[in-house]
């Protein structure tokens, strides 16, 4: 059986016409970039990059271009259980290293980013999306810095959805580097999915708006205008290399 889960979305990025510290003066917003995905087919290569292969977190899916496409004004990202597994071209017999030790590709999905094409510092980011909520889903809308290894480059998770100990949650997070290599300091809020579905049983069937307001002093993460998490000035000013005062690329 070929199992598919789909995620559809539209992006918009707004920047302040005045000082970034004046985030609440919403009349000063100026749209600097948006993507409405109005042309069916592949994403605009002037803006988006496709990832290829097994990438991170020891996840089961192989990322490939065919699983992300524009249709009817949405970016559609498909996670598939393939009818027929194919060989991992990077497989190395007797290797104990991931992903060289994975012989077959059973699941595929897509991950796209704006690295070196659309990067920004401060402002408002809005993403309208409908996310899959079936078991095994790990949808994400996130931002990373570049030029340093993770987590020293700083990570902002506008949205993550996955199951924690079997219970579905929506998360709004940020992390940054510490004195110990590859060890992150997290500011994370995990909201049980029932917080949303108790108010609207059809929540998962609808599009919703995730928003980030980012200035010199804080990062505020919203879902449908509800504040989920605020990462304050301690993180933005005392984190390694002041990573939240540097440009970020978008990923999904």
Segments from the language model and where they lie:
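Bacterial N-terminal signal peptides
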Residues: 10-19
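Sec/Tat signal peptide C-region and signal peptidase I cleavage site
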Residues: 21-25
């Amino acid at each position: 059986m070929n199992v598919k889960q789909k995620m559809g979305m539209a992006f918009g990025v707004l920047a302040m016409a005045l000082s970034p510290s004046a985030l609440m003066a919403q009349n000063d917003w100026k749209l600097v970039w948006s993507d409405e995905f109005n042309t069916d087919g592949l994403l605009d290569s002037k803006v988006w990059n496709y990832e290829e292969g097994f990438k991170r977190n020891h996840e089961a899916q192989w990322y490939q271009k065919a699983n992300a496409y524009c249709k009817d004004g949405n970016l559609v990202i498909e996670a598939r259980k393939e009818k027929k597994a194919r060989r991992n071209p990077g497989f190395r017999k007797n290797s104990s290293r991931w992903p060289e030790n994975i012989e077959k590709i059973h699941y595929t999905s897509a991950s796209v980013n704006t690295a070196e094409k659309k990067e920004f510092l401060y402002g408002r980011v809005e993403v309208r999306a409908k996310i899959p909520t079936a078991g095994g889903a790990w949808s994400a809308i996130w931002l990373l810095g570049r030029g340093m290894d993770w987590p020293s480059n700083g990570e902002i998770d506008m949205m993550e959805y996955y199951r924690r100990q079997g219970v579905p949650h929506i998360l709004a997070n940020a992390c940054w580097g510490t004195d110990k290599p590859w060890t992150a300091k997290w500011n994370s809020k995990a909201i049980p999915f029932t917080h949303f579905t108790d108010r609207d049983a059809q929540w998962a069937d609808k599009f919703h708006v995730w928003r980030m307001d980012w200035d010199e002093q804080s990062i505020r993460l919203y879902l449908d205008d509800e504040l989920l998490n605020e990462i304050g000035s301690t993180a933005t000013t005392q984190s390694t290399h002041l990573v939240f005062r540097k440009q970020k690329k978008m990923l999904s």
